[in-house]
Regions:
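Short beta-strand-centered aromatic/proline hotspots
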Residues: 378-387
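Short coil-to-beta transition motif at edge beta-strands of beta-rich domains
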Residues: 17-19, 24, 356-377
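Compositionally biased, low-structure terminal segments
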Residues: 2, 49, 308-314, 357, ...
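Mixed-charge, Lys/Arg-rich low-complexity intrinsically disordered regions
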Residues: 320, 326-369, 485, 489-512
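Extended charged low-complexity segments that act as oligomerization/scaffolding linkers
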Residues: 1-297, 388-514
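Charged, compositionally biased non-catalytic regions
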Residues: 281-350
Length: 514
């Protein structure tokens, strides 16, 4: 049986099939000129081809970049990016702008290599200062606020720089060294740079007074992993490797990516996603012989049958086709993961797993649908209206069914497990949907019918009307529901099934012991 590391290496190799090499001195195919990186361009092209990877070569020009952006990034798995673009003396700024594009907008690209003739540590420091959660203007403000202590801060700059690199590993030793020798300075820094943690405040202090690194003009996400030995890091869902120019070849890349994701604490689910993506590319299709027997005219007739949301219907059919195709495929990653006993220290990770299994937050404006969860006045509501009725609200006069829930603790949610009717909305919110006062009483989920005049969720909010009784008088009251997340279909269906048995319950009487 393959080890976890061997499995990771194979998954990554299968995941990278389309790459692009970006350098201002690259030699593009069919070009007569012979720029500085001609030999490297040809060598890389052949090396990647021998490994079953299609490599495109792009000669970077700031003038043409926006015109060619779709060509550069569309359907790429890997980007090889020169650290110095457009003849920059010290390099970095243009490359970091492209890295921003990859990390924040080209989210299908999971792998990036920055190759350089500079020292790898220097490039890593610049990436960390650019992707740090603070802007160039904010760092200038930090320097002004801490100006009185600038000389003292400069004395501990080596420790602050090391803290940044080792923030996920050996930071406590370095932090305690500052606390022991510079307690007053530490308090002063923490007062002026307010962050989620003392460690973060110190890292930002070091970056503010490092005049040799590049800062971003906008807020960028922070890394979730840094390896200062391998010179690798993870930002969002992108793994970034910094390599010397002479070391750029597919074998070294696969080895480095494999080592990085194998040692990355959160890498296992990234590998699971990559393997599913590999299986989907290789073996699964939205099209089979039955669908190829359908003409545009026949499909048009089905659409014409009073089908307001035919697009949703067709998309769901295609997704179910894909799910059935994937159902029997083997995940090699599972065999490489050892079985483990319950560990109280991992409660936060167990919770994150349940959030992933249970829900997905959809940020865009959309019509209300089956499984959508809302928050209002400290209570929670989940839409349990059938999908077909959600798609055509007019057929039910815009009346929607909801179940109402209350907040519970993370510990209680984990104790209940799949034996109750609970939902993991995110890492901070957990909801119980059933009404039950004691263990001897039956579990009830009571459906509520609410009027939704406009079924579109806009800016995460939707208005709902409810019939209420105040002082014996009935009236319609309007509430603003705030969208939280969407519970996945099978979990919502379980809640809905139980809720709709409530109206058909039958009351009986027995003599019972008190």
């Amino acid at each position: 049986m393959a080890t976890y590391e061997e499995t990771a290496h194979k998954i990554i190799k299968d995941a990278i099939k389309s790459a692009i090499f970006i350098d201002e001195n690259a030699k593009e195919p069919y070009s007569d000129d012979k720029p500085q990186e001609t030999d490297r361009s040809i060598a890389l092209y052949n090396q990647f081809k021998d490994n079953g990877i299609s490599l495109s070569v792009y000669k970077y020009s700031n003038t043409n970049y926006l015109t060619h952006k779709d060509y550069i990034f569309a359907n790429r798995d890997l980007v090889l990016l020169d650290w110095k673009l457009e003849g920059e003396d010290h390099g970095g700024e243009k490359s970091l702008e492209l890295l921003d594009e990859i990390v924040n907008r080209q989210r299908h690209i999971h792998f990036c290599v920055i190759y350089t003739s500079e020292k790898e540590d220097y490039v890593l420091k610049n990436i960390l200062s650019y992707f740090s959660g603070s802007t160039k203007a904010e760092y200038e403000d930090f320097k002004i606020d801490l100006a009185d202590k600038e000389e003292e801060i400069k004395e501990i700059m080596p420790i602050l720089n090391e803290l940044s690199l080792k923030r996920f590993t050996d930071w406590k030793v370095l932090y305690n060294e500052i606390r022991r020798s510079k307690r007053e300075l530490l308090s002063y820094i923490l007062e002026n740079i307010v962050c989620d943690s003392s460690l973060c405040s110190l890292i930002k202090c070091g970056m503010a007074f490092d005049n040799d690194t590049i800062k971003s003009n906008i807020q960028e996400p922070c890394p979730s992993s840094i390896d200062c030995v391998l010179h690798t890091l993870c930002i969002e869902n992108t793994i970034i490797i910094i390599l010397n120019k002479e070391d750029v070849n597919p074998d070294i890349l696969f080895q480095k990516f494999g080592e990085t994701i194998s040692t990355y604490r959160w890498g296992v689910m990234q590998l699971a996603g990559l393997e599913m993506q590999n299986i989907q590319k290789k073996n699964c299709s939205f099209i089979d012989e039955n669908i190829l027997r359908v003409t545009r005219k026949a499909l048009g007739y089905h659409r014409n049958e009073d089908f307001d949301n035919f697009e949703d219907f067709l998309r769901n059919v295609m997704l179910e086709q894909q799910a059935l195709n994937l159902r029997d495929e083997k995940l090699t990653l599972v065999e490489a993961i050892d079985r483990e006993p319950y560990d109280e220290k991992l409660q936060e990770e167990y919770t994150s797993m349940n959030v992933f299994y249970n829900s997905v937050c959809l940020k865009k404006n959309k019509p209300i649908s089956f499984g959508d969860v809302f928050r209002c006045d400290g209570e929670y509501y989940i839409c349990i209206t059938a999908l077909c009725d959600c798609a055509r609200p007019g057929k039910r006069n815009n009346s929607f069914y909801f179940a109402k829930g209350t907040s519970i603790t993370c510990n209680d949610a984990l104790k209940i497990g799949d034996g109750g009717f609970i939902s993991y909305l995110n890492n901070n919110e957990y909801v119980k949907w059933n009404l039950k006062s004691s263990s001897d009483e039956p579990v009830y989920i009571v459906p509520e019918s609410l009027l939704v005049p406009c079924n579109l969720i806009v800016d995460q909010k939707i208005e709902v009307e409810k019939l209420v009784f105040e002082n014996g008088v009935s009236k319609i009251k309007t509430y603003v529901f705030e969208y939280v997340t969407t519970i996945k279909q099978n979990y919502t269906q379980r809640i809905a099934n139980h809720a709709f048995t409530h109206p058909v319950r039958v009351g009986i009487d027995f003599v019972k012991k008190k």
